[in-house]
């Protein structure tokens, strides 16, 4: 199995776009990319905008190679409703648009489905379902919280197994910070796990200390399973001090022989936390 992180926050954009290829099927999970409209009270820097445009082109190129696309929820860093032609001829597995969903995402889902009417695409609502493609099994969790509660809605986690190796994709759990989010991860016990991580850059503001501590403990529990590589990114890598704050997790990984890294490191590319460095980028313009 080949797992390719295309666009992630450690690569300079808000995204978790990931390409997964087995001998049986090629899948693109969450083909979307965006930027924080404001960070440090500043709009996106031109370097961020250029990177977003570059990453969107890369996502579209990889979408051409995919037979299946999965949308785990309807935030714009995980799907783009305005270029639906990329899904033409594909099988599209969608988080259910009207069940276990908040008002904001429900509206976005309805708009997305309306746009998809112009495209030849096979759509299925995938919450809690399992799909077989040859010897490859793709399984989706039941909807779990986007974060600590239902305010931001629900997401589905993704598990892919081809008889030789296994991969799990958390979507936006912001942790995992509760048992429901963790249960699917522990049940599947995948070898390679991609998790968006706790929202430490909002710690004490929109992300509580309790949720952070739960996330750390849950990640340590996951490390104690069969995982070989744990990728932490997205919400976590909006924080320049993310490694420092996750020291306990890195230590647990080291003791268990589990590699803990960002998506950029996994992909073998330079880590560039452009959003977290936005104020610095603007300052450089003045010098």
Curated annotation (Swiss-Prot):
Taxonomy, superkingdom: Archaea
Family: Belongs to the UPF0282 family.
Protein name: UPF0282 protein AF_0504
Annotated organism of origin: Archaeoglobus fulgidus (strain ATCC 49558 / DSM 4304 / JCM 9628 / NBRC 100126 / VC-16)
TM stretches of this protein: none
